[in-house]
Amino acid sequence: PAVGLGSWITFNVGDDPKLRAECRAVMAAFFGAGGGMIDSSPMYGSSQAVIGDALAKLGRPPGLFSADKVWTSAANGPAQIAETARRWGVGRFDLLQVHNLWDWERNLDTLEAMKAAGRLRYTGVTTSHGRRHGELETVMQRRPPDFVQLTYNIVDREVERRLLPLARERGIAVIANRPFQRGRLPDRLAGRPMPGWAREIDVSTWPQFLLKFILSHPAVTTAIPATSRVDHLRENKSAALGPMPDAAIRRRMAEHVRDL
């Protein structure tokens, strides 16, 4: 499992040169730490353009895994995808996802045709905030994409019941979004002492603790925390290092957070 980089809110900084430089520094640190997947969407304001500007200045690293979304009707999808590629400055995406299942059947037609023509590596569909799980399950059963993106963290665990087992069964890669509940979980845990047994899995901070829980689920491929700070980026990336919790420690982790 790996730690990717989300861009919701944190990279929506407009044309501000100082804030763009901060985002560029985060991306440089991300690639320097071996990072690959960067995820964005047309819904995320200026995030796509900020990513593209940073890639133009940093140079496109060979390990980049470019992930974006189509967030419109199928009729408008090709034009939106072309604009997204222009903003990123890429000729071909590694992954394009149907954002929040918008017109998913026809948008998947578009993405599957792009993949068949060699213009796209992988297809995906997304949901978030625990919504529309039944519909996502239908997609996974009827037209399994290469990737699904869904909300999963140490508190929001509904997907453990059906969607994560189904992803393993169907060979679908899983991207976990909202790993920190948009910062609420680290804020809630800040100042609380780390349990001594966390040393067994090389954890010393709460963000590491939260990410290791997610990454250790056997169905999860990557988690995509978003940040605009280099120190937080490095802390997040470190969660993929060292031993991962087994099933018994995962239960202990969830119980510990629940009881705090």
Predicted segments, located by residue:
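Conserved, mostly hydrophobic/aromatic
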Residues: L5, I38, I51, S66, ...
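Conserved beta-strand edge residues that scaffold enzyme active sites
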Residues: Y44-G45, S128-H129, I154, F180-Q181
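Structured C-terminal cap/extension of enzyme domains
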Residues: F31, P144-F147, R162-L260
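Short Asp/Glu-rich motifs
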Residues: A49-V50, W104, H133-G134, P186-D187
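Short active-site oxyanion
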Residues: G36-M37, Y122, A219-T222
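N-terminal binding-site loop/beta-alpha segment at the start of enzyme catalytic domains
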Residues: P1-L64
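Glycine/proline-rich, positively charged
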Residues: F11-G14, K18, A28, G32, ...
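Hydrophobic packing residues within well-ordered alpha-helices of enzyme cores
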Residues: I51-A54, L111, L136-V139, A167, ...
